[in-house]
């Protein structure tokens, strides 16, 4: 049912989100013309004096979180826009590391609704404009924008980044971004700007990224060429044209993303002390990214949902001391590379607890089992989680993975039970 009545600034956030979901004829409608027009009317095309924009198949969230952590340690006032959220919509906008109240979001939506006139906006475009408006109100020093999909035609690209970052390139969203790494690389490099640093964390960079950098006159800085890092069992070293940083603490986020964030920061020209770098890297953490929630049994949340992320997750699982079995609670979207993702995880998982995800994009438990050959199917993520936890012994590991939605469902179940729900 389409909701025609426009919510007001004082309307609940849930009412606004329901309205936004039904506002535009298409869920994804790549292109910058509509959203740029509304942004100009709102005066949010320059949300802060300095902007980082971060694209990439995987690693965007933790790269943004590391940048945020270091910049805050250095005393900057920082805003971060990221997506999707895990449990609450308000997770998408952080100012000084904190979510804003729902009333701030609804106030921003009312401003956008007033400014857009007859211009139709997607849910993501609306959310992006909202973040930019909130950042402008907060009078920040630095804003970090996480690209939603691709780069060139993503709503975040209406803002000219002072530093553009591409974390990694792998096959995902091929319906929108193209069938191969070269096409995807070209789309993601669309965030590059003339005479501005363009940081690439992907070690096997598609040539199209260099092509776009040359076309735009961007200052390309590639991992393994202009900057690099090396890791030992107990610390890591980073080097670039500015020099070498040694004895860095191993990060809690994936190592390549911490290094990419550091490369972007050092290319930015922003003044940041070595102590702030060390403190920021040590404290950066992001929920749902190899998040060890508890022990006995060990419970790990990871939103890995494509082969590239599953390969990394598999490596992390193999590095853990293993005593018992690994029980995986998994739900996926059917438009992801299910076979490729599961092929990696099979080598570290002993028992599968498969669950369907809701909505038109959700894969059924049976679709997952087709690729696994063995495992149990359940009617919901909550049921799969309960069964895995009931079966797990103290020495076992329960891994929740496959999608943001899967991890979010389990987080919601845990939160509800903690607060006295069922």
Regions found by a protein language model. Give the residues of each.
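Nucleotide phosphate-binding/pyrophosphate-handling subdomain across enzymes
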Residues: 48-50, 137, 142-147, 154-165, ...
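Membrane-proximal helix-turn-helix segments that form the acceptor-binding/catalytic region
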Residues: 185-193
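Beta-strand->loop->alpha-helix junctions that form or flank phosphate-binding loops
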Residues: 81-84, 200-202, 214-231, 248-252, ...
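Charged, amphipathic alpha-helical linker segments immediately N-terminal to NTP-binding catalytic cores
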Residues: 1-27
